[in-house]
């Protein structure tokens, strides 16, 4: 449905002399859709998000900034290039990518250090448990010696 609405808007704006070489707004697009179709404003408003997304993806339209649009076919290649350069600020992505890469490297280094520290802590914690084996043996020995003492005491009591 939204593709059909964009087609209606394209044909209406292309054939309307008011918009000849003159930018138009998203509201103008909506008004042209309502005027040139059997779709009412409520139906169009319920489709605004999808309509806007479809409009952005449609190569016949170009956003020229400041919430204004134009038909790509009405602009020269130089004008389109200027708009694209202004919109995307040529070179900005390379700089921001480099900054993001550096940020990612620092972030990954911190994560690696954190994981290494956790592993180190786990190893030291596990080494604490290694000593428990000796303590278990000591406990067993104490229990056996305690049992022996109890048995000796029971024997003495029986003799008496």
UniProtKB/Swiss-Prot annotation:
Listed Basic and acidic residues bias regions: 104-117
CC terms in the record's Gene Ontology section: DNA-directed RNA polymerase complex
UniProt-recorded Gene Ontology molecular function terms: DNA-directed RNA polymerase activity
Record bears the keyword Nucleotidyltransferase: yes
GO BP of this protein: DNA-templated transcription; regulation of DNA-templated transcription
Keyword terms, alphabetized: DNA-directed RNA polymerase, Nucleotidyltransferase, Transcription, Transferase
Listed Gene3D superfamilies: RNA polymerase, subunit delta, N-terminal domain
Chain residue ranges for the region called Disordered: 94-160
Entry keyword annotation includes Nucleotidyltransferase: yes
Biased composition (Acidic residues): 149-160
Domain HTH HARE-type: 3-74
Domain of life: Bacteria
HAMAP family reported in the protein's UniProt record: RNApol_bact_RpoE
Subunit structure, as described in the record: RNAP is composed of a core of 2 alpha, a beta and a beta' subunits. The core is associated with a delta subunit and one of several sigma factors.
Family per record: Belongs to the RpoE family.
Function, in words: Participates in both the initiation and recycling phases of transcription. In the presence of the delta subunit, RNAP displays an increased specificity of transcription, a decreased affinity for nucleic acids, and an increased efficiency of RNA synthesis because of enhanced recycling.
The protein, known as: Probable DNA-directed RNA polymerase subunit delta
Lineage, broadest ranks: Bacteria, Bacillati, Mycoplasmatota, Mycoplasmoidales, Mycoplasmoidaceae
Gene that this sequence comes from: rpoE
């Amino acid at each position: 449905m939204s593709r059909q609405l964009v087609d209606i808007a394209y044909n209406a704006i292309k054939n309307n002399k008011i918009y000849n070489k003159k930018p138009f707004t998203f509201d103008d697009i909506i008004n042209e859709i309502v005027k040139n179709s059997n779709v009412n404003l409520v139906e169009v408003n319920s489709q605004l998000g999808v309509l806007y997304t479809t409009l952005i993806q449609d190569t016949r339209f170009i956003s020229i900034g400041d919430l204004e649009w134009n038909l790509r076919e009405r602009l020269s290649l130089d004008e389109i290039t200027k708009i694209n350069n202004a919109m995307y600020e040529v070179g900005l992505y390379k700089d921001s990518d480099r900054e993001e890469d550096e940020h990612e490297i620092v972030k990954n280094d911190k994560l690696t250090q954190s994981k290494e520290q956790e592993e180190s802590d786990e190893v030291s914690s596990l080494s604490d448990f290694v000593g428990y084996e000796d303590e278990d043996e000591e406990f067993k020995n104490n229990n056996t010696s305690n049992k022996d003492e109890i048995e000796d005491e029971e024997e003495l009591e029986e003799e008496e």
